[in-house]
Structure formats: C-alpha cells, structure tokens
Amino acid sequence: MLTQAPRGTRDVLPQDSYRWQYVEAMMRKAAAEAGFREVRTPVFEHTELFLRGVGDTTDIVQKEMYTFKDKGDRSITLKPEGTAGAVRALVEHSLYADALPCKMYYLNAPIFRYEAPQNGRLREHHQFGLECFGAKDASADAELILLAFRLLTRLGVKNLSVNINSIGCPECRPKYHAMLKEYLGGRIDGMCDTCKSRFDRNPLRVLDCKEKRCQELVKDAPSMLDVLCDDCKAHFAQLQRYLAAAGIPYQIDSRIVRGLDYYTKTVFELITTTKDGNLTVCGGGRYDNLVEEIGGPQLQAVGFGMGIERVLMLMDSEGIEIPRPNQYDVFVTYMGEHQVEAFALVQRLRVADHGLHRVNGGALHTQQAVVDLQIHHLVDVQLAGEQQIHHRAHLAGIAVLQRQHGAVRLALLHGFVGGGEIGIGDQLRLR
C-alpha cells in the first residue's frame, strides 16, 4: 500500500505531462479568447456550501463527498465540483459589484468524488470549468456551448453531439413535479432504494438515475418542455435560435436534468460516440438562483465543467496525436576530464534562457538517444587533436540523423584546456 496510489487516483508522470500541458494550453486559449479570467479557489470548503449549493438530494451530497472534521471541529469537504466554490468566491469578494457579466474559468482544479472508478472517471479528477455571472440572455448559454464545441473540435474530437433541454424555474417546475409524481406514483416499487428515498422531495432525481430499472420507468415520462412557463419557453426558444445562427447542430433531449439541484432553465451536454458507446465529455447549464442561495444578490449565471482526464482518454481512443515539445534546446556532452568546463558552459547558457541538460558523453553513445531526447543543439566540450577528430566522426552519423528525422540541429563547440574560454557560436542562439 505504501508504494501504491490510493484507488481512484492516478499519477501524471514526467513523460506524459506534456499531453496535459497541451490540452490545458488549448483550454486557456479558448477561455481567454472569450474574455474569461482565471479564478483559483481552495481545494476544500465548508461542507454547508455544498449542502446548500449542490443539493442534499443529489448523489454527490448523499454518497460521494469526502467530508471530515478538522481540528477545530468544523465540517470540511474536499471540493466535489467547481461551481459552488466559484460562487462563494464571487460573493465573498463582491465581484458582482464590478462590471457585469463577470466571466471566470478554473483549470486543472482537482475534484473529489467517492464513486466507483472507471475509465475517464476517477475519485480524484481534474476539471476545466467556465462560469458567467450576470448574463440573463440566452446568448450567454449559447456562447458557452459554442466555446466547448469549438474547443473539443480544435482538439480533434469527432462525432460531437450537442444535447440541450430546459428544466424550468421555481415558477413552472412545481407543476412538473406534480405530473412526474403522478406518473411514477404507481411505479415506486420498481425504483432503486435511492430513488425511493428521494421521490417525495425531488422526483427529478429519478430522471438522472443511472440504474437500468429506473431508466426503464422514466422512458415514457412526461416532458418538462410541455409545462414551461412563458419566460422559460421564450428563453429556450431563443437559445435554439442562437445555436442555429452559429451553425452548430443540436438536438433536444428532455431527459437531461444533470446531477446538481442548482440548475434552472437551460441544461446541456456534449456527447461523443465511441466504440464503447456514448460518452459525455462536457456538461453544464444555467443556475439563476445559486448566487442568492449562497448569500449574494439575485444574479443570473451559467457555466459548464469538462473533465480533463476524460478529454485525454477520448483523444487517446480516437488516435489523436499530441505534439511532443523539444525536451532540450541544448545538450552538452564532454569527454575525459572536461566536466568542470561543461558545467560552466551549462550555467552560462541557462542564464541566457536556454532549456538545457548536461550529461557525460558516455551516456550519449547512440544516435537514437539524440532523437529520443528531442535535442535542438548538441554541444561537445573536448580536447583538440585525435580525440576531437574521433568524436567528429561519431557525430557525423548524428548529422545524417538530422536530415532523416529533422530532430537535431547540430552545433560543435571546442573547449581547449589551458586558459582558453569556451565560446558560444551564433548557431547556438537559434531557437
């Protein structure tokens, strides 16, 4: 156990981190292009934030939260989702007093949920999330959907489907609750135990249940779209017009309710088809009452979350190649007793802001090693005379490798013992 990561967690190893960095850079770029600024909130919050914000009838609160008492006897919870913490930060720091809308994103935020680990879903996973506060119009909903769609398309994800729904508001949802209770009332015995316990307080949770028997029970259930109030109906129609105008294909799925109680009006999912079936890669919606519920002013908001592990898994399964960056700008080798001279050269190059690695020449005895290390320049610190000629012959093969692979730009430096200073050729300053 000592040398094993806890179940449901995973290490990102040095040889794999470039993949994360590439995806994260694309996410940052997409957020910045749309005017979102980064927010970083604590990895844990007071438990009450999630009880009030996420909803005490959700799977997250009832089954999945990592909650504990700290040494001050305060109930603390590791963050199970990103929105509640972002809203808390907005309220605590009165960010709503600035110009609206207030647009923020979080990236590589660790999320903790105690659930059965599966491919693309871990107990600790990382999210990219966007939150837009103070935007009432459905154009904000459309903007986030389009941003997620274009980001995933840029990353090479294919077969994307945009699924949308409206789950109404406090004005029209009670009517739907009554309809759903009437429809499911004679079917309670067929529900799972969790849905039975939630049925009276929040029958919508039955629609979100992953148990097959519950999914069968609700497949012919009435649709919320049939009882939307005029405001919700107009908002949903407006969203569809924006998506159509942007040329983004979408479909209406009245079964989407998402797993969080704070959603109102728009909910959406971006789904892709894989060899193993449908995979939800992004989900979100509008939450017009959450800011007020947490203690702020009445402020409309919309957001989404996207799992980074799931995006990377999807890219792997579709064979999408992520460009590997050059590991070293300059690679210094040395022969014989020239370790000190090589060390001095490395430090001078680092001051000049070159990515650098110093290694004994004996460790670089294969041409393929130069390619594997993604080296731009190879620097050899050596004596003049026979050793120099011998090593040049060795490096000639690497020059051939350069022409074959385009991986190495070869540069030779000659360090001379006896007070001569090591010079840096112009070619070394090439990036």
Annotate each predicted stretch with a short phrase.
Residues V351-R431:
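Intrinsically disordered, low-complexity segments enriched in glycine and mixed charged residues
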Residues M1-D353, R358:
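TRNA-recognition modules of translation machinery and tRNA-sensing kinases, especially anticodon-binding
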